[in-house]
């Protein structure tokens, strides 16, 4: 009887330790890159070019022939692949894509405002602060998930953010957050920029500034972030592109499509680098999303968003990485909110995001 009890005791210890080891073995993601493209509609993400907008002389910039030649196909799966080839090949085959409302797969802003600062705050803080109600809002008083991650010993000083729009200095609370935030026309590279960063800074200074000093062209944000990724090896990186929103506000549908297509190409660029580098290969997750939607019921409102635009709360996201089952386009009926992204991002790194404010639960099914 004594031998049996001893054997049971050691068996329980063995099972306990094995379970711990198994749980650690299951966590493969060591790095994450969060990527956003401002105000890019789910309608184009899942349906490709919208012919009703492309045919409208008010929006097609007098070049509907080029738009059709480059982005049109009668079949929707082919059409969306023309616009976003990386999303609909690599991400669709190895990751998950959410937000196609044709299948009642709904992803929405939880905040009631449906524009940028509140949307990004919801993404990173994991809850809705209704006081955050302006793009000119002060430094965000709410702790964001990047800030939380940066305080964890394993990730300390391994977090960085790059954004085309200067408001990210306030959205992420640059004075407080403790990690580099490089936006708009802020020089990259800190006190010791590399030769490539010095060149980027010089080109940025002399560049065309269609959005004044508030926002740079996406090409600069991309190459700043890529140089940081390659030379400083962060474990957590956020990159925010802005031209999809800017060209939409201008009513330039061709430029909007071109910006989205280029965004897709840059995501591919990021992924190919990740898969070629030993630190990142098979150990990195990507989380791709937007801050808000745009109008669609009234096609003239595709340029706009905000609480007075019926469809502007409708968003989408995609995720891929070693811990995410390859489910492709999600066609099951469900409701997801933007405030769930923060905890989902933390969970992919094996963390639970806690803060002085509420944090919504993560999204089930994203992680093995």
State the predicted function of each range.
Residues 351-368:
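Polar, surface-exposed loop/tail segments
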Residues 125-138, 178-213:
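Acidic, His- and aromatic-enriched active-site or binding-groove loops in soluble protein domains
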Residues 175, 223-269:
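Active-site His/acidic residue clusters
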Residues 1-28:
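Bacterial Sec-dependent N-terminal signal peptides
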Residues 71-170:
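Long, well-ordered early-domain segments
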Residues 33-34, 42, 264-303, 345:
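Metal-dependent active-site segment of extracytoplasmic phospho-/sulfohydrolases and closely related
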Residues 26-96:
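Active-site-proximal N-terminal segment of extracellular/periplasmic enzymes that hydrolyze or transfer
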Residues 120-126, 304-349:
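Substrate-binding rim/cap in mid-to-C-terminal beta-strand-loop elements of soluble/periplasmic
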């Amino acid at each position: 009887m004594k031998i049996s009890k001893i054997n049971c005791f050691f068996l329980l210890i063995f099972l306990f330790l094995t379970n711990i080891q198994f749980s650690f073995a299951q966590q493969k993601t060591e790095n994450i890159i969060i990527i956003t493209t401002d105000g890019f509609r789910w309608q184009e993400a899942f349906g490709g070019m919208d012919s009703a907008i492309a045919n409208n002389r008010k929006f097609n910039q007098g070049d509907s022939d080029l738009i059709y030649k480059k982005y049109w196909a009668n079949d929707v799966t082919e059409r969306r692949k023309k616009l976003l080839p990386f999303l609909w090949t690599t991400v669709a085959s190895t990751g998950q894509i959410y937000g196609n409302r044709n299948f009642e797969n709904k992803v929405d802003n939880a905040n009631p405002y449906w524009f940028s600062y509140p949307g990004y705050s919801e993404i990173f803080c994991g809850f809705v602060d209704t006081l955050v109600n302006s793009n000119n809002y002060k430094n965000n008083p709410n702790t964001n998930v990047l800030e939380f991650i940066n305080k964890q010993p394993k990730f300390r000083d391994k977090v960085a953010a790059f954004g085309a729009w200067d408001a990210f200095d306030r959205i992420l609370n640059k004075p407080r957050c403790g990690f580099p935030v490089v936006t708009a026309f802020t020089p990259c590279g800190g006190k010791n920029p590399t030769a490539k960063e010095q060149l980027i800074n010089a080109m940025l200074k002399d560049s065309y500034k269609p959005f004044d000093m508030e926002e740079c062209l996406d090409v600069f944000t991309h190459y700043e972030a890529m140089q940081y990724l390659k030379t400083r090896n962060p474990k957590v990186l956020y990159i925010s592109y802005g031209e999809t929103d800017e060209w939409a506000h201008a009513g330039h549908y061709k430029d909007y499509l071109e910006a989205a297509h280029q965004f897709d190409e840059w995501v591919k660029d990021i992924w190919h680098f990740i898969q070629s580098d030993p630190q990142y290969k098979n150990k990195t997750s990507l989380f791709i999303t937007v801050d808000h939607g745009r109008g669609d019921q009234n096609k003239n409102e595709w340029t706009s968003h905000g609480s007075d635009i019926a469809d502007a709360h409708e968003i989408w996201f995609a995720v891929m990485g070693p811990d995410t089952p390859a489910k492709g386009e999600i066609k099951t009926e469900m409701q997801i909110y933007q405030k769930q992204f923060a905890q989902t991002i933390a969970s992919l790194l094996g963390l639970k995001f806690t803060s002085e404010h509420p944090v919504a639960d993560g999204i089930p099914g994203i992680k093995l």
